[in-house]
């Protein structure tokens, strides 16, 4: 197969950053994505409706002329988030979800939730108004090995939330383990997951064997090949529970290539192209459209996009860097080829 036409896809998890960087991140993701769930972990984070809506306006101001790209906003949950704030956010019409960052789990998560029981009244309000609950599913206990933090979170925390709030729609984001695949598969239809392109294409050997490659360092961290294969199986299974979320997370080159580098991989420059490679690797290009264009909007109760994009099997070389505000970002596959491109 050398050409594929699919319904315009959406990205159900992205970091666009803010300030001078917005112009570059929005340019990249709006090339062919119809919508994107925009993460709220700014500095300071988008912890209330007013802040999230102001961020929406800043993003929209950077959408290139002629693009119909629409950002979907997310509230950043803290120990102090109130049920009333959830109702305000829902009423805004622009904020479609609220996000759990366990305090300290990832970039700019220090304001996050210290104990999930602190937000139980908020989860009840979300269940009542129909707001989605997005979860960074890792524990932050320093005694837990970094490769086990997703599994332990599912066993100790997420399983209880799912049981206590059966009507709450939950997205376990950027899953990285067979444990997560199995949990989501066996859970009710109210539980779904996003999967990144880099977790489908790479495992921890790519990051650590033969030298440390910091641009593969992200959270949750890349796992064993057996987990990578489980993710590929889930994405290509045709299950409606799994959909596209790039978790594209830009950091300046010098912040990644450092003694203590930041977590995050940049894929917005070639998101659907990288997913096409992943699906082709398991002979499942016929399943790409549902994963990229149908399952996400269906789970969010939003209309599917009505137009299409066409992918062509034509190799191209990725630049060594892309502009990122007043600095540069090194993208995934920098200086190497990608097999597919959007026509």
Curated annotation (Swiss-Prot):
The active site is at residue 247. It comes from the Bacteria. Gene3D superfamilies: Metal-dependent hydrolases (3.20.20.140). Substrate binds at residues 15-17, 41, 136, 219, 251, 263. The keyword Zinc applies. Binds 2 Zn(2+) ions per subunit. One of its GO terms (molecular function) is dihydroorotase activity. Zn(2+) 1 binds at residues 13, 15, 99, 247. GO terms for biological process: 'de novo' pyrimidine nucleobase biosynthetic process; 'de novo' UMP biosynthetic process. GO terms for cellular component: cytosol. Homodimer. This is Dihydroorotase. It comes from Shewanella sp. (strain W3-18-1).
